[in-house]
Amino acid sequence: MEAKNTKKPSRKLVVFKRELPFYLMLIPGVTFLIIFSYLPMFGLVMAFQDFTPLRSFKNSPWVGLKNFHDMLALPTFWNVVGNTLSISIAKIILRLLVPLILALLLNEVVHHKFMRMAQTVFFLPYFLSWAVMGGVLRNLFQYDGMVNELLGRIGIDPIMFLGSNTWFPIIIILSDVWKDMGYNMIIFLAAITGVDPALNESAALDGANRWQQIWHITLPTIRPIVVMLLVLSLGSVLSAGMEQIMLLYNPMVYKSSDIIDTLVYRLGLVNHQWSLSTAVGMMKSVVSFILVVISYRIASKHFDYQVF
């Protein structure tokens, strides 16, 4: 009688069978990433061509760096870069500062029900899309909107908030902070609650007041979290929020609120300058990548913070 084959399946095969459902669930996300993130990279060749859809990639003539030269020669280019940097930097600073202050204040709240309610109120706008937020902001700040109606009741003339080069960037920045501050606030609050209570108790016994405990214990302890969020933010310093601005802006505020992404949109989809539009977008991507590398090096060297 032949001996039965009792060889056990390999450990790798067992693990693969166990994890197969998870791999299958990854397929839609990976497919979406490949189609909408990696395949479009082949279009970067347009930045070095005089591209038109009728001639396609194959027959469009190569022009070298001409499109990048034309990009720098655009009369509005440097104004657009300045708008992008000013709006984006203001957003980055306030996205860190406002949530941090709110987290410190909520950490001092004694009533847990009030704290949970406040967390919900601050975090709720984060789940709203900019399509919804754009409608809310228009109803609030348009010429016959709620804000101007309230101003009129106290004797102040209506203000064209959405048509003013002074007010429009302020609305863009503050509304972005309002929408996203809940996310960072939760992160900061979780980090603060992780601070060892014994440190604060020892400091209190030594005569430190609450402000001194926050300044010398809480803030240094959560510094790695702040650095992490800052590093993640610096990579998007050239992304000032296209969806938000596109839903609200108009030609009256191009001077103060036209950013790189909206310039790419107008050049490509409105003016049909495909190659020039691609050159501007490629410039933004390359500079953003360099900024990510630099910010990581700074965080690693000066704050002893490493991601990989």
Predicted regions and their residues:
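Short, Lys/Arg-rich, polar N-terminal cytosolic tail immediately upstream
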Residues: M1-F16
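A structural signal for multi-pass alpha-helical bundles of membrane permease subunits
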Residues: R18-F308
